Amino acid sequence: MMEENTIGKIQFIERKITTKSSDPVRRKTFAEVISPVNNTHITNASRIKRFLTDLLFPRRCPVCGGIVLPKGELICPGCVKKLSFVKQPVCKKCGKEITSAEREYCLDCTKHKRSFDYGRALLNYNDTAKKSMADIKYRNRREYLDFYAEAVCLRYGKLLMRLGADALVPVPVHPSRRRQRGFNQAEIFADRIGERLGIPVCPEMLVRRKKTAPQKQLNPKERLHNLEEAFAAGAGPEGGTRVILVDDIYTTGSTMEACARALLRAGVKNVYFIAICIGRGQ
């Protein structure tokens, strides 16, 4: 219900900013719209860093790429409506939107056993989200991850803190791909979340030891087979550890499943995940 109200408020603000009014009413920021609760879980250090960054380097919109106005906003007011925020009802396991509140799980999670406890995502993976994710990975728009981390923490920060996780673990890319791209977007995203919530980020806990074929051209069964033994636990996992896997996109869940299995084999007790985008459920 709270997520439905949040989406409704976003739509209300969209209408409001396009209507002229002489009333001296302060317009809500995107942060207030997406999470109307008290966001005390976001650290003061993170707020100061964001203020200084905005002052020196004007924030660019993760949707249109233009400089965001008015200053201090997280996204162009007119671009908010192009993002499809995940809303209830959602699958209790992976967090995908589902068609009926009477169902507990999406079709994928009904058909396939999941090793992770559960996870959540911010956006449905529509065309706008696809372009933004591609801009991050292939056009070096790493600054967009600041916005997505802020939005995830505003919406799910309290949930993530309640998990009592010992570490945020970004889904790793193969070393050759990292050298080619120059960075791992999941690791930067995890760093930004960790800064805001005060949760340690431990990329060394999971390594990618096999370069795999692109997942987007494979069906769910082929995806999981493609990822067999692709991941292995690295330094750090201990018995009883709780971790939150962090990635940019969750589609069929094959990558998250392979990562969770590797961590659980190493003795990790609980595995959760958070992602920016997620595919549509059924």
Regions found by a protein language model. Give the residues of each.
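Glycine-rich phosphate/pyrophosphate-handling loop used in enzymes and phosphotransfer proteins
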Residues: 2-282
